[in-house]
């Protein structure tokens, strides 16, 4: 095998430096392009378009009025739920959207339920417990209206706000 002389080796060294630089630049540029192409998958935003972010939750005004059953179904389709009656965000939501909206509280045969999951709710922990406890109706659903929970007929149509946690 024939060995290369010093001049040939020197030429290879001179040519390999620009080639290496071009390869490095090409790798960096393609990496940036790949990142920009897959940006949504790599770094998802906290809330999707149309949802409003507040305190680790995303809120959506559906701009639809419907009954509680349909409201729960609509929020589930969006992988969300109706706002809970015990959340401190109710007043903030009212000030943002400025409308009455369903909350996930329902009274059925002296049982208080979260209509998102049909689990029992201890209403003694709610701020307007005395007002709620005085309800004598066999069935009642609730909306948040001007700073308080207000009883209404479950089949009536009210505004629907959906809520979900970040990255869900």
Swiss-Prot record:
Gene3D superfamilies reported for this sequence: Mannose-Binding Protein A, subunit A
GO terms under cellular component: host cell Golgi apparatus; membrane; virion membrane
Residue intervals passing through the bilayer: 15-37
Record's signal peptide: none
Boundaries of every C-type lectin domain copy: 54-163
SUPFAM superfamilies associated with the record: C-type lectin-like
Membrane topology classification: Single-pass type II membrane protein
KW Ribonucleoprotein (keyword) present: no
Cellular compartments annotated: Virion membrane; Host Golgi apparatus
Glycosylation sites (chain numbering): 133
Disulphide bridges, residue numbers: 75-162, 141-154
Entry keyword annotation includes 4Fe-4S: no
Subunit structure and binding partners: Interacts with protein OPG161. Interacts with protein OPG164. Interacts with protein OPG190.
Role, per record: Forms a complex with OPG162 and OPG190 to coordinate the incorporation of OPG164 into wrapped enveloped virion (EV) membranes and, subsequently, the production of actin tails. Therefore plays an essential role in efficient cell-to-cell spread of viral particles.
Homology family: Belongs to the orthopoxvirus OPG162 protein family.
The protein's name in its UniProt record: Protein OPG162
């Amino acid at each position: 095998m024939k060995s290369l002389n010093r001049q040939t080796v020197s030429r290879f060294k001179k040519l390999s430096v620009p080639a290496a630089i071009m390869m490095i630049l090409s790798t960096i540029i393609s990496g940036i392009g790949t990142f920009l192409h897959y940006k949504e998958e790599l770094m998802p935003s906290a809330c999707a378009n149309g949802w409003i972010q507040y305190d680790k939750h995303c809120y959506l005004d559906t701009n639809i009025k419907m009954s509680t059953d349909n409201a729960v179904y609509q929020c589930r389709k969006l992988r969300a739920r109706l706002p809970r009656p015990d959340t401190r965000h109710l007043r903030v939501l009212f000030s943002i959207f400025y409308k009455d909206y369903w909350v996930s509280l329902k009274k059925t045969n002296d049982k208080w339920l979260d209509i998102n999951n049909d689990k029992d709710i201890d209403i003694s922990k709610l701020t307007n417990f005395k007002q709620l406890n005085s309800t004598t109706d066999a069935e009642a659903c609730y909306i948040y209206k001007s700073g308080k929970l207000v009883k209404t007929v479950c089949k009536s149509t009210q505004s629907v706000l959906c809520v979900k946690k970040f990255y869900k």
